[in-house]
């Protein structure tokens, strides 16, 4: 049996409050809206009761933020791509921001189990003046549990149309890609955090974002396998390779906190679900 599910979450600004409305079909839900930072920023948690995707499953997620709204979206646990008998599993996420909107897309990691045939697509569309901080974390197998990513493949697609595109196909049997210094160098977690804007960032603001990120990286244990870059005037990215998810996620959270303060003058308020 396969699952096909959709979820649409819309943030709107009503007076001084960001309000969330959602629609769904299939096993995708949004938990109660929370306001740990006050009415202006709405925190939401996506729940997928089946707990993972197998071959033939499709999840479609669409999030919009209206002018002046600020939403933060996360998950209570990893997205798990399990073994497939032939059909691929697909998760598609689209983030659309109107002028002046802000969004934080902070899901926990995706785990690729051996034998999976999976694709994870993220598309971001931002109007002028909109800004977004998001991340993407992928683990290949569960090394700590002696469950390697021995066969199967994973396709990743991250795009801001006309501005930035990253696409990769990670095949478990591609030893050059998985283990050589030209690829993952034997690491089994790849992660990135990105700040994207709907219009060109001022040069000084963009450089400061790079400097802030590099300062965080230099103080972290993963500094040898992490780096910050700006592939476009609207995008700043930190990429990292790690043996496990936890150290990579720690680095991403530190960069997120630093960027939140730098770009938005907002102290970081960790989503409550992360401490459960």
Swiss-Prot record:
Subunit structure: UreD, UreF and UreG form a complex that acts as a GTP-hydrolysis-dependent molecular chaperone, activating the urease apoprotein by helping to assemble the nickel containing metallocenter of UreC. The UreE protein probably delivers the nickel.
Protein name: Urease accessory protein UreD
Keywords for this protein: Chaperone, Cytoplasm, Nickel insertion
Gene that specifies this protein: ureD
UniProt key word Cytoplasm: yes
GO CC annotation, single: cytoplasm
Membership in a protein family: Belongs to the UreD family.
Organism for this UniProt entry: Polaromonas naphthalenivorans (strain CJ2)
Membrane as UniProt keyword: no
Domain of life: Bacteria
Role of this protein: Required for maturation of urease via the functional incorporation of the urease nickel metallocenter.
Pfam families for the chain: UreD (PF01774)
């Amino acid at each position: 049996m396969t699952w096909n599910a959709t979820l649409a979450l819309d943030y709107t600004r009503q007076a001084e409050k960001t309000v969330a409305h959602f629609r769904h079909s299939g096993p995708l839900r949004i938990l109660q809206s929370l306001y740990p930072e006050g009415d202006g920023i709405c925190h939401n948690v996506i729940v997928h009761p089946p707990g993972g995707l197998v071959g033939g499953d499709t999840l479609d997620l669409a999030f919009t933020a209206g002018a002046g709204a600020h939403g933060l979206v996360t998950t209570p646990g990893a997205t798990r791509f399990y073994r497939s008998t032939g059909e691929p599993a697909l998760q598609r996420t689209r983030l659309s921001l109107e002028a002046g909107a802000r969004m934080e897309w902070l899901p926990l990691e995706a785990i690729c189990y051996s034998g999976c045939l999976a694709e994870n697509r993220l598309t971001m569309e931002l109007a002028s003046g909109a800004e977004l901080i998001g991340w993407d974390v992928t683990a290949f197998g569960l090394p700590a549990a002696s469950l390697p990513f021995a066969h199967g493949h994973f396709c990743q697609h991250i795009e801001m149309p006309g501005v930035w595109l990253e696409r990769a196909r990670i095949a478990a049997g591609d030893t050059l890609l998985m283990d050589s210094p030209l690829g993952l160098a034997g690491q089994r977690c790849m992660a990135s955090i990105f700040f994207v804007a709907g219009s060109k960032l001022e040069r000084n603001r963009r450089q400061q974002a790079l400097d802030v990120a590099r300062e965080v990286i230099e103080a972290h244990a993963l500094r040898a396998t992490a780096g910050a870059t700006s592939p476009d005037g609207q995008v700043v990215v930190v990429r990292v390779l790690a043996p496990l998810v936890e150290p990579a996620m720690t680095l991403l959270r530190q960069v997120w906190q630093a960027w939140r303060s730098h770009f938005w003058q907002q102290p970081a308020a960790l989503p409550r679900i992360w401490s459960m």
